[in-house]
């Protein structure tokens, strides 16, 4: 509560003095248009947050509040306008912003698309092509649900998880995580455990963990209809309605963990599938979980994309158009200490004020000499 009060007070002070815009300018926000990213759009946030990951959710009502604020302070543009302007270096004479949705959840079609059409707001959707039209879950959703069920069933969740990983011969690049006694301090809850595993393992090892958890506390993927992906018919309708459709890979594998061949397969084949289905050129790509390194960016370029989007401020100097920053928002991103929508906090989010105090935890550099094992990351 103290932290939320401090954040609210700081945001109000910066907003009313205009210092938020100055800080944003010093942080480089004037040089890069604002690109916002969302994931799931739901009707009842509180109900969904009890079962699913809250940070992936925004209610339709809150999304409308945020979009209305953005619309009053920025000119909303499509990625198809924003990208070429950045490419040719043409200046923006007014603040502009673009809206994006990641992962291709069906509720974006159900709840976001009608809102966007009613308000005439351009937007983009980055989809995971292998999941389109199926009942399979995103790997991180499935992992989270399995861990939540396992932690409820196990007497000591973190300790049992460490033992499960040890039995699979899987070691995580997290200090203490491979020690059964220390692990309980690092993964105290299912969400933290999911993040440690999802961001720390290549896809082939993550699949082994999911398989082992399924053997102990299996779930029926088909029963979680709230988490299902778009159908191809929905994707086509969104495209016809004016939404830009971009790739988010074939399977949502984190590219910095994978071999060059796997990254090329994930990016190029996803692009080809979208182009074939939609009959249009696919120019935009979003990195899964916003994670990338120099090798992944190079392959994204080879796959034929003109523009790619991250979730941090780091830019690759060789490929600035393939490392365009985005700001991810969710239900609570712009709430004050009393849980109300706050224009000052929204303004600070839009101008990158909180990014000044944040530190990117990713390692974006990958030495050219690094060895790459099939299906793994550098040296692994």
Annotated model-derived regions:
Residues 27-33, 37, 136-241, 372:
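Extended, charge-rich helix/loop segments that form flexible
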Residues 39, 248, 252:
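Histidine-centered divalent metal-coordination motifs
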Residues 92, 105, 113-126, 176-221, ...:
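CE4/NodB-like, metal-dependent polysaccharide N-deacetylase domain
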Residues 129-134:
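Short beta-alpha junction loops
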Residues 71, 115-119, 230-247, 301:
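Acidic (Asp/Glu)-rich catalytic clusters
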Residues 105-106, 251, 255:
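Short, glycine/acidic-enriched loop or turn micro-motifs at the edges of active sites
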Residues 1-100, 107-109, 135-155, 208, ...:
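C-terminal active-site subregion of NodB/CE4 polysaccharide deacetylases
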């Amino acid at each position: 509560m103290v932290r939320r009060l401090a954040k609210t007070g700081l945001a109000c002070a910066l907003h009313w003095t205009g210092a938020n815009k100055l800080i944003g300018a010093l942080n480089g926000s004037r040089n890069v248009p604002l690109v916002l990213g969302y994931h799931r759009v739901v009707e009842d946030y509180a109900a969904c947050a009890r079962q699913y990951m809250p940070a992936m959710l925004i209610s339709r009502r809150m999304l409308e509040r945020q979009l209305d604020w953005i619309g009053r302070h920025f000119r909303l543009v499509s990625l198809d306008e924003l990208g070429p302007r950045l490419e040719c270096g043409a200046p923006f004479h007014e603040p502009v912003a673009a809206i994006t949705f990641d992962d291709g959840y069906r509720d974006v079609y159900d709840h976001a698309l009608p809102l966007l059409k009613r308000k005439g707001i351009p937007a983009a959707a980055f989809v995971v092509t292998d999941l389109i039209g199926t009942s399979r879950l995103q790997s991180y959703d499935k992992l989270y649900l399995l861990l939540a069920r396992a932690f409820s069933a196990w007497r000591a969740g973190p300790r049992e998880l460490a033992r499960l990983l040890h039995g699979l011969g899987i070691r995580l690049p997290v200090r203490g995580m491979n020690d059964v006694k220390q692990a309980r301090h690092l993964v105290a809850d299912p969400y933290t455990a999911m993040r440690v595993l999802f961001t720390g393992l290549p896809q082939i090892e993550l699949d082994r963990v999911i398989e082992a958890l399924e053997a102990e506390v299996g779930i029926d993927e088909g029963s979680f209809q709230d988490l299902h992906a778009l159908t191809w018919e929905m994707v086509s309708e969104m495209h016809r309605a004016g939404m830009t459709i971009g790739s988010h890979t074939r399977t949502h594998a984190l590219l910095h963990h994978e071999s060059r061949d796997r990254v090329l397969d994930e990016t190029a084949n996803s692009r080809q599938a979208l182009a074939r289905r939609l009959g249009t050129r696919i120019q935009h790509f979003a990195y899964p979980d916003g994670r990338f390194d120099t090798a992944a960016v190079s392959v994204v370029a080879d796959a034929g994309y003109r523009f790619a989007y991250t979730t941090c401020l780091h830019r690759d100097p060789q490929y600035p158009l393939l490392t365009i920053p985005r700001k991810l928002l969710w239900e609570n991103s712009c709430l004050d200490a009393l849980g109300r929508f706050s224009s000052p906090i929204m303004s600070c989010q839009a101008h990158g004020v909180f990014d000044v105090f944040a530190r990117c935890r990713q390692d974006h550099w990958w030495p050219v000499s690094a060895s790459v094992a099939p299906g793994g990351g550098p040296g692994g």
